[in-house]
Amino acid sequence: MHFDPHRAASMIDSLETDAATKASMLKAFKRRIELFGGNIHFFREPFTPVSLTGTQCSLYCKHCNSHYLRHMLDGSGGKLYSHAGLLKEKGAEGILLSGGSAADGSVPTYAHAMDILKIRQEMKLKISAHTGIVDDLQAHMLSEYLDMALMDVIGDDETIHDILGIDACVRDYEDSLRALSSAGIPLAPHIIVGLHNGKLRGELKALEIVRKFNPEVVVIVVFIPTKGTALEGIAPPRLEDVVKVITKARGMFDIPLSLSCVRPGGRYRSMLDKYAILSGIDRIAVPTRNAYEISRQLGLNIVEIRKMCCSYK
C-alpha cells in the first residue's frame, strides 16, 4: 500500500479543531513518517495482566479504587506459577505482572521473585511489570527477572497527593526511573493523560523526566472515568489535550510511541485512535475498526503483532 502524504494533510485539515493543533499534528505526523516510514503496528492481543496482590491495594486512588485489579488474574497466594503455565499452554509469549500498591506506591513484585524466576527460566515467557515507585535495592532485585519495566510517570505533586493518595512527589518518580535504568532494566514509561480530573496537569513535565533515561518505548495512557470511583462523573480528557501530549512526545523521542489499551471506549475511543494516528503514534494496542480504516485511507502498511504487549519494540 502506498502512503499518501497529501491525504494526511487533508484529513488533519478537515478535523474540528483549532489551527495550532492541526499544525502540531501535521508536524508530528511528518516526523513519525521520517522515523518509521509507512508502517503502523497494531497489537491486538496484549499480555494478560496478573495481580500479585489479588484485589488488595493499600491505596484508594480516585481513578481506580482497586477496580482494575478485579479484572486481572489473581496471582496471589501462590497462584502465579500455575496461571503462567496455563497462559503458556494457550500460546502466550509473555505475562504482565501487576497488583495493588503498598502505601509507599511500590508494587511488591520482588516478593514473588522465586516464582517469577522459575516462570522465566522454565516457560521462556517475557516478563514485564508495573513497578510503581522503587528504590535502588528493589530495582536491583527486579533486574534479575524483568524484561521490561512499565512505570506510570506522574509529573505533578498535587496529582500524586490528591488523586493517587501517595505521600510522595515528582522527584520520587524520577528517582525510580533512575534506579530502574541504573539496574539495566529496559524502560517503557507510561504517561497518563488527564489523570488529574480529566485535565492536563504534569504530563508534559513527565515527558521531560522520561527523556533523561533513554526508554525503549513511551506509552500514552488515557484516563478512563470508571464507575465506582471518585472520578466516575468526570469527562475524559479533550482530544486536543491528548494530541498535545502525543505531538510533544513525538517531537522529543525517536523511539516507538504507543497508544495504550487503557483508554476510554465507545465513540471517544474511535475518534481518539484517529487523532492519535494523525498525531504521530506508530503503534496501537487493541485498535478500533476506525484505526484500521484511517490507516488504510492514509496508505499506511498495517503490521499486526499477535500475543505481544505494545511496550516492546
Provide a role label for each language-model segment.
Residues 27-66, 74:
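Long amphipathic N-terminal alpha/beta scaffold segment
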Residues 1-30, 35-40, 204, 211-313:
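Auxiliary Fe-S-binding modules of radical SAM enzymes
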Residues 8, 38-39, 54, 63-186, ...:
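Conserved Radical SAM active-site core
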Residues 185-195, 223-232:
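Short, flexible active-site loops
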Residues 42-44, 48-50, 95, 127-129, ...:
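Hydrophobic faces of well-ordered beta-strands that scaffold small-molecule active sites
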Residues 100, 132, 192, 223, ...:
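Short loop/turn motifs enriched for small/polar and acidic residues
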Residues 56, 133-134, 287-290:
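Short beta->alpha linker loops
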